[in-house]
Amino acid sequence: MNNTAQQDVSALSFEQAVEELERIVSALERGDVALDKSIEIYERGEALKKHCEALLKAAEDRIEKIRLDRAGRPQGVEPLDAE
């Protein structure tokens, strides 16, 4: 995949990337795409998958849980996966 296509992927929102990835999967499952085109869209699908995973990881890193003291009062926040 060329750099322009990769840049296009990085500009997509999570929802846009998932939607395009679903279209690619459907086209590949139908089997009505020529071999060369199948390889091309498969590679784009891989880039979309990686982009979605990166966006999910970034969102996960931003989520925090509220830490409570013994009386149940908010005491601060900590990463969601602090265990």
UniProtKB/Swiss-Prot annotation:
Gene3D superfamilies: Exonuclease VII, small subunit. One of its GO terms (biological process) is DNA catabolic process. InterPro entries: Exonuc_VII_S, Exonuc_VII_ssu_sf. It is found in: Cytoplasm. Keywords: Cytoplasm, Exonuclease, Hydrolase, Nuclease. GO terms for molecular function: exodeoxyribonuclease VII activity. One of its GO terms (cellular component) is cytosol. Its main location: cytoplasm. Its EC number is 3.1.11.6. It is an enzyme of class 3 (hydrolase). It catalyses: Exonucleolytic cleavage in either 5'- to 3'- or 3'- to 5'-direction to yield nucleoside 5'-phosphates. Bidirectionally degrades single-stranded DNA into large acid-insoluble oligonucleotides, which are then degraded further into small acid-soluble oligonucleotides. Heterooligomer composed of large and small subunits. Belongs to the XseB family. This is Exodeoxyribonuclease 7 small subunit. The gene is xseB.
